[in-house]
């Protein structure tokens, strides 16, 4: 198929059967080009480019570049945004001639080698290379660029020299799912690098101290969402210690799934230093047994597990979210005036107390066999979810907020509109989908004696999750009510109890 796009601004071609797409002619109006092959011919389909479009700004090609093509840079010299998916990058020199690239994305298992010399002297800001067979990558040509973001993912690279990036103005460096065993961050210890991501690489040691004056965000694993458990353990990760004690500007550390980590150092008594700026620390799926975060006065979010038996959150006066996967403790009492969200998982715990957490707003508990959970004093608790547990008794609070019914609608709407927490394809769900009020599974006794009058919101959102117990096998055997409960509510409770074969007890 031959195409001559003379007067259009945007050209999009999808091939369902034609194995070759040839572009020829000249166009001064074309600004965007999008070409792709369907899966059946993706491996063999190729683009033959022999056209000239000097004003094109964006190129998006999924498929191979034919060896018969002219250099893409000579065809589209002023292209700023170039995305090449499942490509082979074509013959040597296929990318020569570009004058003003800002973003370049390349992926494809047929890419086995790449010479970055075509980028030398260009003001490129973002370079992403993923899912290739490149084992060596010479960064020297990037020395004279203005590269801000470098992202390398799923490439068999074993060694990477970072020195050429030192003066480019690099802001974000990401290396994931590669075979790099060592990394010298002194080579990029400039004044600009604020985000570092090193995930699932067989590094035996990771020293981030050279970035102590600039680094703000560190990824060695995943960021944890409050309403999900961690989804993946990175098996390539080898380093066991993560020393953060020297960091002066570090705000977020995301390490969920980094299964090799046993120790996180937050202070160094010998050097009289400690990290003070941390706001988020995500360490689900690690081998950390104990952690003392008491000195982190700015900490807002903490997730730690799977082997944790001790966690000191004293003096964390701004802590709002806490997630613990606890394998050893049988008695856990939390005390925090700021804590709003608690996620807890621990099969051995027999007593879990949160009565000294007055601002507690949402609680989700998994895999617990505590005899009782008393939330009577938690009068701000609007969301409670218990899964895969065997709880003897749960005592509900009487929510003190006058507008708590309206609060449900506000929060459900807020979380439904959040593109991160609403991403179902990632296993992340909204408040409404995941909790929707008090959702109790496998609890023998439900105590609602704090209530003397049941509003419609309380019935719908707390007690019966939409006026009905959804899963009959998980309904309570006993419901404790206040003997002063108004008669109409007693009647409603008895009707519900009869339906689920539960006993009503006056208190």
Where are the language model's segments positioned?
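LRR N-terminal entry segment and analogous cap-like coil->beta motifs
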Residues: 1-43, 47-68, 73-80, 215, ...
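Glycine-centered beta-turn/loop sites at beta-strand termini
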Residues: 4, 72, 97, 185, ...
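Canonical leucine-rich repeat
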Residues: 21, 44-47, 59, 69-72, ...
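Extracytoplasmic/secreted cell-surface and envelope-processing proteins
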Residues: 91, 457, 488-490
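Leucine-rich solenoid repeat scaffolds
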Residues: 376-423, 471-507
